[in-house]
């Protein structure tokens, strides 16, 4: 019984200390300061689990069709995705350096994520990251899937290929 009382007292003390720390404004939410590693880890774990759980829609078409990949590249450029994520031969825009967490390197992400997960992220966005919900912005599912097709091909797309697919937009 004493152990339970001690655990309860400790839990209350931790809750009070956490409340003072977070609600007292001691935790900085400034984008100029990086989160501690434990916070990055916790948010990353929650984000990965949430995406995996909610991403249930499967591709309605093959994603390796060249015309779909090229349409996805054009949509990626037209929607300004390169501003935060860059593109083959196109650097990230300067403003993206101020985003926290940093926008991910898509060449790495697309290797780890399934198409259904990429679709879910592009369609629904990610809270507190700057990643918009393009599905709410009126982007159609076929266009979203085309972007996913391009993303899956992204690691092997050369700057010349990308420029040929999108023309002058974005200007490298």
Please place each PLM-identified region on the residue numbering.
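Periplasmic c-type cytochrome electron-transfer domains
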Residues: 2-74, 135-150, 167-172
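Flexible coil segments in periplasmic/lumen-exposed cytochrome c-class electron-transfer proteins
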Residues: 33-37, 78, 87, 94-100, ...
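Extracytoplasmic/periplasmic/luminal assembly and interaction segments
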Residues: 53-102
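Conserved beta-strand positions that form and line the central face of beta-propeller blades
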Residues: 68, 105-106, 130-133
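Amphipathic alpha-helical recognition patches that constitute DNA-binding helices
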Residues: 71, 105, 117
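Conserved acidic functional residues
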Residues: 80, 108-109
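Short Fe-S-cluster ligation motifs
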Residues: 110-128
